[in-house]
Every structure is written in C-alpha cells, then in structure tokens.
Amino acid sequence: MAFQDLLGHAGDLWRFQILQTVFLSIFAVATYLHFMLENFTAFIPGHRCWVHILDNDTVSDNDTGALSQDALLRISIPLDSNMRPEKCRRFVHPQWQLLHLNGTFPNTSDADMEPCVDGWVYDRISFSSTIVTEWDLVCDSQSLTSVAKFVFMAGMMVGGILGGHLSDRFGRRFVLRWCYLQVAIVGTCAALAPTFLIYCSLRFLSGIAAMSLITNTIMLIAEWATHRFQAMGITLGMCPSGIAFMTLAGLAFAIRDWHILQLVVSVPYFVIFLTSSWLLESARWLIINNKPEEGLKELRKAAHRSGMKNARDTLTLEILKSTMKKELEAAQKKKPSLCEMLHMPNICKRISLLSFTRFANFMAYFGLNLHVQHLGNNVFLLQTLFGAVILLANCVAPWALKYMNRRASQMLLMFLLAICLLAIIFVPQEMQTLREVLATLGLGASALANTLAFAHGNEVIPTIIRARAMGINATFANIAGALAPLMMILSVYSPPLPWIIYGVFPFISGFAFLLLPETRNKPLFDTIQDEKNERKDPREPKQEDPRVEVTQF
C-alpha cells in the first residue's frame, strides 16, 4: 500500500498512465483478434458430396441429356429428414427414376448409398476458403473444427500458467515483448501451414502467447495505477476485446480467404514488438522484488513523461527506501512457493473461489463467442453485435466499479447470464432474432462480470503473489475456454446439452461471490502482511478520502 504514497512523491502521473494504458490497449486489440479467429477461418460452409455426373467438367451434355443442375442433383444426392440434400452421402448410381416423380416425396431408403469417397463440393458464397475447405473438416471429420478451437484455448491455459510464473520471475515488460514476437512468428507461419496438424500446433503456441499478453497487460496497467485511475485503467485494459471482435467481423467480411485473414491479424505484431520498447516495467514489481534502484529509475521515467522536470529531486533512493521500508524488508524474505501458498488458508480460499467463478464465466463466455454459427445465420452481424455489447459492458464497468459492490454486482450478472443461456434451449431455430437477442444479452452480462472479476481479483490478492495467483485463475478460466468448444460435440447426442452445461455453471458460481471479501474503494495489498492487517482491521475507508476514492480519472 505504501507504493501509493511513493507515487505521490512522483507527482501527478496521469499523463503517463493514460499514454501507457492507451498503448497497451491498442496492442491488446491485436491480441484479441486471435481469440475468435476460428469463427471465420473455421466456418463450416454448406457442402455435399462430389459426384461424377454433376461436377466432372469432362461430362458433356450428350451424357446427361442437357438436364438442369437441380435435376442432376436430385438423381445424385439423397434428401435428409428436412428434405434437403444430404451433406455426407450420395447415391452409388444415379437414380433416374426420381426424375419422373412430379413433386412427390421419393422413397430412397432402398437405394444404394455411400459416403463422399471423392470429396465434397462447398458453397463458397460466404468464404472462398477456410480451414474446413482446405482439409475437408466435414462429416466424420467435422469435430476437428472444435479441436482447432480447443488447441488455441489449451494454449491459453498453458499460457496462464507460464505467463504468471515467468512474469513474477523476469518482469511484466520482458514477458510482454517476448510474447509479441512469438505471436508475430507463429501466427504468420500458421497462415502457411501445409497440414492441419501443423496448423493446430502453431495455434497452440499462439494461444500460449495470447493469454500471457492479456494477463500481463492487465497487471501492468493495474500496478502503475493510482487509486483515482485504478478502475478506469483496468476498464480501458478490457475494452480492446469488444473493439477487436467488431474489427474482426469487418476484416472477415472484407477478406474471405483464411490464409490472408490469418496474415492480416499476425504480421502487425512485428511492428508492435518494435514499438513496445517504449513501455516501462512495473516499478511496483521491481521494488517488491528487492530491486529498488531499478524501480526508482522507472518511476523517474514515468514522472519525466508526465512533464515533471524535477523528478530527480523529488524521487530519491532515500525517499523510496523510507516509504517502502516494510515492503523492502518483506522482499528480503523468500517468496511464498506454490506449496506455501496452499498452506495459507485465506489466500488459498480466495484463489479457489476466484478460479471457480472465472471457470464458470469463461465456460459460458466462450460457449457463446466460439459458436456464432450455431446462434444465427449471419456470422458477421452476430460477431459485430457481440463486440458492441462487450464494448458497452466495458463502458458501463467504471460506473459499476465506483458505485456497486463487487460481490452483489457479479452475482446478479452471473444469474442473468445463466437465465439467457438456459432460455436459448427453448427458442426454436426459426426464431433467429430472439436467439440472437438472448445470446447478445447473456454475453454482455458475462463481459461485464469478467471486467469486475479482473478488478476484484487484483484487489483481494497481494502484489507479491498477484501474478502467480492470476496465472492460476487464468488456468482455470482457460480450462473452461478449452472445454467450451468440446462441449458442442455433445450436441450430436442431445442438441440442448451444451447449452445446459453453459448455463448451469454460471448459476452455481453466482453464490460463490458471497464468500469473497468486499473490496470496493480499498487500496491494493502489496504484501501478505497487508492482507492480514486488513482482516484484523476491516474498516471501510471514508468515501471523501481522496487517497482511496475510485473515480473515473
């Protein structure tokens, strides 16, 4: 908590805080573009079996009697239960007798059929090329589209573990810059992948870097923020997701080839990597990790960028050591290991509850976000609506962070999310508008709850173990994200089953917030001792105290 007093010695850092937050937010937009990429690159177009008499260019009119395309389709492809051409079967031999039925429904159950042994013909109106058309991920292989989404989310799960550990050890800025370069390289290579296996491997590596980027971006913003800027800073760090999803819909609408789309969202990372050298390391992290000289250097840089010309006079090593005396003494001690953290009942309880609530929210969040094709016919419009409602939720977040209790607001939002998801089950496919409204409302509730959860998680965990704890939370969140696309495979057995799973978890997790402490308008904990002192003296800070009031700026 003494770090806030140290920032007071540095003067008003609002200019630096805004500039660094804006830079990180712009970079985060590029990161979020990768999250929902498979909504378009793995789009499943309409398809049917390739048949010789219909699709072979060498077949002449003499062979077919100049029959129309509809007639040739009728004798070559059987109809499914909805009287539409089958997607995965064809007649072994042309059924010429079907030409003379005059509109009656044919009985083709006795006709010999076979799978699409010669491949498929795809409807390329929506997309000229996707990974589905590239590697024929349809029919028996259609579940591989969920696998493609799963491997990216699995990479995010691993990134949540590695990112937190490496960030605590090497610093926020170093991990950020490394991950920018990693996404640039593996994302570009994914566009040129010759096989589905190589593509999935590269997307896995992209997921590792993407999660580390998001986690470290939020931490870097939060750890430089004064109390007055804390809520707005975290909110600005979350806004890029909505902007990115709307941007992705526009890019996918303009670029219908998955190779080019993959390149467009990956190549800019080379520029981001070069420009990220402007970012400053977290002075709070440096001081807490017993590097006061380096922390002082970063503080002076921040003060200079905010226009403070006398930073060297107002910020000295003596002032830093006297202000942060307790924190520096704590830094001399060995950091708690993961096993030691598990023996801290209160910290362990908080991490467990945060992890479960994040798991439930992310299961629903990605269940909606990764399956826009299951919710509406126009994936471009629905993705844009999703992005808009996420952005709106993030705009509402500063008000919610300032005026609403953390626990009550998150509990209500999770209940709303559960209701929307479970209601989708009872809305027929024909009522597309209502399904889209419910999905959009549910996603907005999930996005707002997610922003509040990031703030709440930062507020209940001390700085010295915050990155590690957030890494654990991110791991559970990304386990849910990885499982979300796999849940859709269960629709083969029962179409409502995935949506039941998506809806039940948020409902249960809503009650878990009652077990977490209320942290609105309270400063961040820097050490384990700060957290213990707060439990011994849990007095609410006065609202009029400018040091602890959370305002928009």
Swiss-Prot record:
Side of membrane Extracellular, spans: 37-143, 199-203, 255-259, 370-378, 429-436, 491-495
SUPFAM superfamilies in UniProt: MFS general substrate transporter
An example Gene Ontology biological process: sodium-independent organic anion transport
Reaction(s) catalysed by this chain's protein: butanoate(out) + estrone 3-sulfate(in) = butanoate(in) + estrone 3-sulfate(out); propanoate(in) + estrone 3-sulfate(out) = propanoate(out) + estrone 3-sulfate(in); pentanoate(in) + estrone 3-sulfate(out) = pentanoate(out) + estrone 3-sulfate(in); dehydroepiandrosterone 3-sulfate(in) + butanoate(out) = dehydroepiandrosterone 3-sulfate(out) + butanoate(in)
Stored PROSITE patterns: MFS
Region feature (Disordered): 528-553
Regions crossing the membrane: 16-36, 144-164, 178-198, 204-224, 234-254, 260-280, 351-369, 379-399, 408-428, 437-457, 470-490, 496-516
CDD domains, sorted: MFS_OAT
UniProt GO cellular component terms: basolateral plasma membrane
Membrane topology: Multi-pass membrane protein
Listed Pfam families: MFS_1
UniProt xrefs under InterPro entries: MFS, MFS_dom, MFS_trans_sf
Positions of glycan attachment: 39, 56, 102
PANTHER family, per database record: SOLUTE CARRIER FAMILY 22 MEMBER
Protein name stated in the entry: Organic anion transporter 7
Organism name: Homo sapiens (Human)
